[in-house]
């Protein structure tokens, strides 16, 4: 039986997230069930137990101060993969730092590609589908009038089970930080 894979994401539950989910429903209906998210740790098998990984993540996330990122333009990862995404433009370094800090212990693995902070719109089977979807996504994103910002204050540890991703545990950021209101 193959091992479960795990990932770490932050859900985008604001108008940007709604935009991405609506666009995905239109362009790739078979994946319409996926929630809009920024991937912090791409899918991987654990080197230890789920409980140990969760303990590490809880402690590490408690020391991270919540932050905002600003989104940039719509791009693709072609020719590497037929994925259409929105770039993280401002504060991408914060996402990369978080990725690097949390890639240790039970979550350590060799990733297939260099880590690039992004908000996935869709991943297709064929390059041509991704190119066509990218054209539509760029047009729609240019018309989006809301704030292109994501507040990162909670991560979600997720597990792949039978091809579906399930939430394992929420990980609030900054629990170990002193309040700035003291």
Predicted regions mapped to residue ranges:
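Histidine-dependent nucleotide/RNA phosphoesterase domain, centered on the 2H-phosphoesterase fold
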Residues: 1-182
């Amino acid at each position: 039986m193959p091992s479960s894979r795990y990932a770490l994401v932050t859900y985008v539950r604001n108008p940007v997230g709604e935009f991405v989910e609506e666009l995905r429903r239109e362009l790739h209906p078979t994946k319409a069930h996926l929630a809009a998210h920024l991937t912090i740790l791409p899918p991987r098998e654990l080197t230890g137990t789920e409980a140990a990984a969760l303990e590490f993540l809880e402690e590490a996330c408690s020391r991270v101060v919540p932050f905002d990122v600003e989104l940039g333009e719509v791009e693709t990862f072609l020719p590497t993969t037929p994925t259409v995404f929105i770039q993280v433009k401002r504060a991408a370094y914060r996402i990369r730092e978080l990725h690097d800090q949390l890639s240790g212990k039970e979550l350590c693995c060799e990733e297939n590609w260099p880590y690039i902070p992004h908000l996935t719109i869709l991943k297709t089977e064929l390059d041509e589908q991704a190119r066509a979807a990218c054209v539509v996504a760029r047009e729609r994103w240019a018309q989006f009038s809301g704030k292109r910002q994501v507040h990162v204050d909670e991560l979600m540890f997720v597990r792949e089970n039978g091809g579906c991703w399930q939430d394992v545990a929420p990980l609030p950021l900054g629990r170990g930080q002193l309040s700035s209101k003291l």
